[in-house]
Amino acid sequence: MTKEIHKKLHVLIVEARFYDGISDALLKGAVRTLQKAGASYDIVTVPGALEIPGAIAFAEKNSKVFYNGYVALGCVIRGETYHFEIVANDSCRALMDLTVHKHLAIGNGILTVEDEKQAWVRANQDEKNKGGFAAEAALCMIALKKRFGDNH
């Protein structure tokens, strides 16, 4: 992606703060990627991954601010109950529904992992940098929307 493609872009980062340290690492990666691309951004915080799609939907429908795209950041770590599957599947499905049915450019940076060690490897900028990857995905989807003539 070139900086020219991202000129004047404004992105909303929605971060779930269930795991504060991991959330911080994901956010740093996303912010750094958006800054390098020259995109401006706002950040809103929600309690957990299930609330991320709702926050994006609220922003899209009710916000007085126009967002070209969205970055979803969070972490779901498998526990001893079925709750992991519900949160992982439903948060991802809801983001896909927003992308497909509402034509939103969303980068999904919700980690779904077995343990905290896997989460840290994926969140750290000097390792997998999934926060940065989610921001880059959002920027790519914004560019793709523009390519197909959708400027909203």
UniProtKB/Swiss-Prot annotation:
Q: Report the GO molecular function annotations.
A: 6,7-dimethyl-8-ribityllumazine synthase activity
Q: Which domain of life is it from?
A: Bacteria
Signal peptide, first to last residue:
none
Q: Top-level EC class, please?
A: transferase
- EC number(s) of the enzyme? 2.5.1.78
- List residues binding 5-amino-6-(D-ribitylamino)uracil: 18, 49-51, 75-77, 108
The protein's matches in Pfam families, at most eight in alphabetical order, are given as: DMRL_synthase
Q: Which residues form the active site?
A: 83
**What family does the entry list?**
Belongs to the DMRL synthase family.
Record protein name field: 6,7-dimethyl-8-ribityllumazine synthase
Lineage of the native species?
A: Bacteria, Pseudomonadati, Pseudomonadota, Alphaproteobacteria, Hyphomicrobiales
Gene from which the chain derives: ribH
